[in-house]
Swiss-Prot record:
It comes from Escherichia coli. Disulfide bonds: none annotated. GO terms for cellular component: extrachromosomal circular DNA; protein-containing complex. GO terms for biological process: defense response to bacterium; killing of cells of another organism. Belongs to the colicin/pyosin nuclease family. Residues 36-45, 516-529 have a biased composition (Low complexity). This plasmid-coded bactericidal protein is an endonuclease active on both single- and double-stranded DNA but with undefined specificity. Colicins are polypeptide toxins produced by and active against E.coli and closely related bacteria. It is an enzyme of class 3 (hydrolase). Pfam families: Cloacin, Col-Pyo_DNase, E2R135. This is Colicin-E9.
Length: 582
C-alpha cells in the first residue's frame, strides 16, 4: 500500500462531479396522460384536443401550426415542439423524450412527498468522511429506454422545491446572481454496471441560476440549463402529477446512505430555475440526466473502478476506514435481520404451540365421540330402542368433531409451515450475521494495521546503494529503493507519523549532492521543504504528479511502516500498476 505523495494534494474528498453508491426510494413518473392523473386536455396548458395528445405543428388554430408565433417560422417564443410534456412530481425521476424544440415538462408544485423529504433530512444528519454521499432514488434499465439516435435519447428529469435545498431563499438572491449554493443535488451515478438517479450531499456544491422566460402560451416558460436541452416548462400548483414508474425506471427500495462515486453527476446538468415575479410560481430545482446505453454504462463503470482504485492506493488509511464503516453498517443490518427473524420465530412457535393444543383438544373430542358411538352401537339397527336416539346423537357429535379436527389440522399445518419457514429464515439470518461478523473483524484488523501510518514509530532498515539517476527506477518494477545514505541518516530516529518520515526522506535527499544532482531547480526547492519532487509528465496520473512512497509488503499484510527495506519510491503511474498486479 502507498504512503501517499507527501504533498497533501490528494485530500481524500471525491470530486463533486463524480458517482454515488447507494441507497434509495423514489418512484419514476409516467409520461402518459390519463383521467384522474392530474394531466388531461382540460388542465393541459400545452394545448392539444381531447385524446389528441400534444401537437406543436400542423393543424389549425392560433399558435398551433400556421398561427402566430408557434409555427416553425414564428418568433420562437412559443416553441416548435413535438414532444409530449412529461408530468414531473417533486422528487420523482420522470422519463422525458426531447422533441425538435427540447424537453417539455409539466412540474407539479405540490408538497414534497414525505419519503423524499425524509431522504433529504437523513442526508443532513450524515457525516461520512472523505467523500460525498447519497441515497439512490431510482435505477435505469437502458435497454428499455436508450434510442439509437443520440438526438432522441431520453432524459431523466427530476425536480425539487428550490428553497428546500438552497442555503438561502432564491427570492433573496440578486437578479444578476449566476450561481447558488445547495445542500443536495440530484445526479446520475453508476454502481454494479447500473445507472442510478441519486440525491447527493456532503461536499460544498453550487448550481447555476437561470431565469424562465414566458412564451406566447399562457403558463408555459422556456429555460436553458447549460449543457442540457432547452426546457419548455409549465407549473401546476394545484393538481399533483401521477407518481408511477416510467418504463425502464425501477424504484430502489434500499434507502441506505452510501458514499457517492468519483463520476457522480458525469451525465447530469442541473440548475435552479427562477420564474417571473408576476407568474406567482416559486423557484424550482431541475436536474436533467442522460440515459446511457449499456456500453456507455460499462465504460463509465470502468472509469469509476479505475479512479476508486487510484484513490485507495494513495489513501490506504481512509480506504480501510471506509471499508470498516461499511462492514460495521452491514453487521448492524445483519443484527437487525436476526432480531426481526427471532421475533418472527418466537411468534411462530407461540402460534404453533397454540394450534397444536387446539388440535389435540379437537382430536380428544373426536375420540370421545367415537367412544360414545361404540357405547350405543348395539342400538344402531333397532330404531325402536331407546338407545338408538343416543347412538344417532353420538354420530352427529362425531361428525362435528371430525369437521373441527379437519379445520384444526389445517390451521396446525399452516402454523407448522410458518414455524419451519421462520426457523429456516432465522438460521439463514444467523449465518449471514456470522459472515458479516467475520467481515467486520477483518476490516477492523486491516484498519488497525493501516492506522499504524498515523502512529509514532522508529525507522529501521539499511536501504541500498544507488547512483545519481536512482529515481529513473521509480517507474520500473517495484520502484527505487531508499538510498543507503538516507537510511543511515534516519535509522533509529523516532517519527510521529509516516507523513513526518516521508518529509524527512526528501529533506535528506535535498542535502545529498549526488542524490539531488539530477533534480531541476523547482524540484530541488520542493525537496528542501520536505515535499516530494515532480515526476516526468508521462508518469503522472490525474492529480497525482509527484513521487510516492510504496510499502513493498502491504501494511495490511504485516509490512512494517518504518522499515526502509520495505519502502520503495515509485511514480504515480507505476504505483497504480503495482496495486493492479501489473
Amino acid at each position: 500500500m502507498s504512503g501517499g505523495d507527501g504533498r497533501g494534494h490528494n485530500t481524500g474528498a471525491h470530486s463533486t462531479s463524480g458517482n454515488i453508491n447507494g441507497g434509495p426510494t423514489g418512484i419514476g413518473v409516467s409520461g402518459g396522460a390519463s383521467d384522474g392523473s392530474g394531466w388531461s386536455s382540460e388542465n393541459n396548458p400545452w394545448g392539444g384536443g381531447s385524446g389528441s395528445g400534444i401537437h406543436w405543428g400542423g393543424g389549425s388554430g392560433r399558435g398551433n401550426g400556421g398561427g402566430n408565433g408557434n409555427s416553425g417560422g414564428g418568433s420562437g417564443t412559443g416553441g416548435n415542439l413535438s414532444a409530449v410534456a412529461a408530468p414531473v412530481a417533486f422528487g420523482f425521476p420522470a422519463l422525458s423524450t426531447p422533441g425538435a424544440g427540447g424537453l417539455a415538462v409539466s412540474i407539479s408544485a405540490s408538497e414534497l412527498s414525505a419519503a423524499i423529504a425524509g431522504i433529504i433530512a437523513k442526508l443532513k444528519k450524515v457525516n461520512l468522511k472523505f467523500t460525498p454521499f447519497g441515497v439512490v432514488l431510482s435505477s435505469l434499465i437502458p435497454s428499455e429506454i436508450a434510442k439509437d439516435d443520440p438526438n432522441m435519447m431520453s432524459k431523466i428529469v427530476t425536480s425539487l422545491p428550490a428553497d428546500d435545498i438552497t442555503e438561502s431563499p432564491v427570492s433573496s438572491l440578486p437578479l444578476d446572481k449566476a450561481t447558488v449554493n445547495v445542500n443536495v443535488r440530484v445526479v446520475d451515478d453508476v454502481k454494479d454496471e447500473r445507472q442510478n438517479i441519486s440525491v447527493v450531499s456532503g461536499v460544498p456544491m453550487s448550481v447555476p441560476v437561470v431565469d424562465a422566460k414566458p412564451t406566447e402560451r399562457p403558463g408555459v416558460f422556456t429555460a436553458s440549463i447549460p449543457g442540457a436541452p432547452v426546457l419548455n416548462i409549465s407549473v401546476n400548483d394545484s393538481t399533483p402529477a401521477v407518481q408511477t414508474l416510467s418504463p425502464g425506471v425501477t424504484n430502489n427500495t434500499d434507502k441506505d446512505v452510501r458514499p457517492a462515486g468519483f463520476t457522480q453527476g458525469g451525465n447530469t446538468r442541473d440548475a435552479v430555475i427562477r420564474f417571473p415575479k408576476d407568474s406567482g410560481h416559486n423557484a424550482v430545482y431541475v436536474s436533467v440526466s442522460d440515459v446511457l446505453s449499456p456500453d456507455q454504462v460499462k465504460q463509465r463503470q470502468d472509469e469509476e473502478n479505475r479512479r476508486q482504485q487510484e484513490w485507495d492506493a494513495t489513501h490506504p488509511v481512509e480506504a480501510a476506514e471506509r471499508n470498516y464503516e461499511r462492514a460495521r453498517a452491514e453487521l448492524n443490518q445483519a443484527n437487525e435481520d436476526v432480531a426481526r427473524n427471532q421475533e418472527r420465530q418466537a411468534k411462530a412457535v407461540q402460534v404453533y404451540n397454540s394450534r397444536k393444543s387446539e388440535l389435540d383438544a379437537a382430536n380428544k373430542t373426536l375420540a370421545d365421540a367415537i367412544a360414545e358411538i361404540k357405547q350405543f352401537n348395539r342400538f344402531a339397527h333397532d330404531p325402536m330402542a331407546g338407545g338408538h336416539r343416543m347412538w344417532q346423537m353420538a354420530g352427529l357429535k362425531a361428525q362435528r368433531a371430525q369437521t373441527d379436527v379437519n379445520n384444526k389440522q389445517a390451521a396446525f399445518d399452516a402454523a407448522a409451515k410458518e414455524k419451519s419457514d421462520a426457523d429456516a429464515a432465522l438460521s439463514a439470518a444467523q449465518e449471514r450475521r456470522k459472515q458479516k461478523e467475520n467481515k467486520e473483524k477483518d476490516a477492523k484488523d486491516k484498519l488497525d494495521k493501516e492506522s499504524k501510518r498515523n502512529k509514532p514509530g522508529k525507522a529501521t532498515g539499511k536501504g541500498k546503494p544507488v547512483g545519481d539517476k536512482w529515481l529513473d527506477d521509480a517507474g520500473k518494477d517495484s520502484g527505487a529503493p531508499i538510498p543507503d545514505r538516507i537510511a543511515d541518516k534516519l535509522r533509529d530516529k523516532e517519527f510521529k507519523s509516516f507523513d513526518d518520515f516521508r518529509k524527512a526522506v526528501w529533506e535528506e535527499v535535498s542535502k545529498d549532492p549526488e542524490l539531488s544532482k539530477n533534480l531541476n531547480p523547482s524540484n530541488k526547492s520542493s525537496v528542501s521543504k520536505g515535499y516530494s519532487p515532480f515526476t516526468p509528465k508521462n508518469q503522472q496520473v490525474g492529480g497525482r504528479k509527484v513521487y510516492e512512497l510504496h510499502h513493498d509488503k502491504p501494511i495490511s499484510q504485516g509490512g512494517e511502516v518504518y522499515d526502509m527495506d520495505n519502502i520503495r519510491v515509485t511514480t504515480p503511474k507505476r504505483h497504480i500498476d503495482i496495486h493492479r498486479g501489473k
